[in-house]
Amino acid sequence: MSSPDQDPREAIAQGDDEVIDVRRGMFGAAGTGDTSGYGRLVRTVTLPGSSPRPYGSYFDDVVDTLTESLQSNGIEFHQAIEKVVVYRDELTLHVDRAALPHVAQHLRDDPRLRFEMCLGVSGVHYPHETGRELHAVYPLQSITHNRRVRLEVAVPDEDPHIPSLYRIYPTTDWHERETYDFFGIVFDGHPSLTRIEMPDDWHGHPQRKDYPLGGIPVEYKGAQIPPPDERRAYN
């Protein structure tokens, strides 16, 4: 817990890499007659921990400005941001899911930040990261300042709900639907959260790592393609 006199940006301590899995062998090598030696590979799977200050480039300015902007609305930085990661010259803010709309709104509307564009939504599944198995990643672009930042939110399998950013970034409309379709993340507040690529009656979410591979025919039962001027519009 931070003290009252502590800089709120320092309340997020530097963290070690987080080990989420240990993988052994090659793809499908277990129990085979593999004699190459690769079957004995052991690889630790890690996620980067919190990065120390200074972050470098424009990253410190973005974090400082976001801190001030959030505080002006009574939101403490360390309550909204779980960790700040600089990895391979990219800035990622790991956001508490309840604070996601507030953080996105400030990043978009503060004239010193002006991240006007959300470039998409990506889903990630880490089945061995207990309590944080599903991640949603939002790359944001500031056209005004020529800067980029990435937001990342993690939720458990048992409660895969994240607030939709559709009202703030309408471009996330189909991206959130695709992430729901393939990973099962439910974006609360989305105006039309339905499958976008798989059939409506499909069971499961095909890009999760626990989804069975191959051999399932995809059937769009009773599908009819109307003429272009009669096709439904999505929002």
UniProtKB/Swiss-Prot annotation:
Reading the lineage from the top rank, the first entry is Bacteria
Quote the EC number: 7.1.1.-
**InterPro entries attached here?**
NADH_DH_suC (IPR010218), NADH_quin_OxRdtase_su_C/D-like (IPR037232), NADH_UbQ_OxRdtase_30kDa_su (IPR001268)
A molecular function annotated in GO for this UniProt entry is: NADH:ubiquinone reductase (non-electrogenic) activity
Q: Where are the transmembrane segments?
A: none
Q: Which reaction does it catalyse?
A: a quinone + NADH + 5 H(+)(in) = a quinol + NAD(+) + 4 H(+)(out)
Q: Which UniProt keywords apply?
A: Cell membrane, Membrane, NAD, Quinone, Translocase, Transport
Mode of membrane association: Peripheral membrane protein
Which family does the record assign? Belongs to the complex I 30 kDa subunit family.
Protein purpose: NDH-1 shuttles electrons from NADH, via FMN and iron-sulfur (Fe-S) centers, to quinones in the respiratory chain. The immediate electron acceptor for the enzyme in this species is believed to be a menaquinone. Couples the redox reaction to proton translocation (for every two electrons transferred, four hydrogen ions are translocated across the cytoplasmic membrane), and thus conserves the redox energy in a proton gradient.
What interactions and quaternary structure are annotated?
NDH-1 is composed of 14 different subunits. Subunits NuoB, C, D, E, F, and G constitute the peripheral sector of the complex.
> What name is this protein filed under?
NADH-quinone oxidoreductase subunit C
Origin organism is: Mycolicibacterium paratuberculosis (strain ATCC BAA-968 / K-10) (Mycobacterium paratuberculosis)
